Amino acid sequence: MADRVIEELDEDESLRLISAGGIGRIAYQSRFGPAVLPVNYKWYDGAVVFRTARHSALDEDLQTGIAGGDYLVAFEIDDYDTAGRQGWSVMIQGPAHHIESEEARERAKQAGVEPWAPGDRELFLRIVPHRVTGRRIKPA
């Protein structure tokens, strides 16, 4: 008999779990193939908001993909208790966009996302969810 169960989370519960912000992973098609990078994020104004450096590998890959259309990415956030063998994960899928206008950047700064990575990280990006899914593993 299994001692764990997996529960599918609805969108509201998934968004509640990620609303505090933290560290998530952006998955996208880079010029070298599929890539997954951890970034500090905040949930703000109905979107995942994060920062990166101009001309970084992430910026260059996304600039190429974003130009002229929606560049679809996945963003994954999770929290686990390895000793208790339980936790949850949420995946957001949708287009990534640079936050271009000064007004929009000022609003995004209000989200308070602070990258751990050193250096100038003044390029703001957002992912607007088209699909939100989540799962929780817990004791049976």
Show which residues each predicted segment covers.
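Short beta-strand segments
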Residues: 21-54
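Short acidic/glycine-rich loop or secondary-structure boundary segments that cap or lie
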Residues: 36, 49-51, 58-60, 84-85, ...
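Short connector loops at helix/strand junctions that flank enzyme active sites
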Residues: 19-21, 36, 43-45, 67-72, ...
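Compact nucleic-acid interaction/catalytic patches
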Residues: 44-65, 73
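Extreme N-terminal tail/first-helix region
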Residues: 1-19
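Charged, gly/pro-rich active-site loop segments
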Residues: 2-3, 73-140
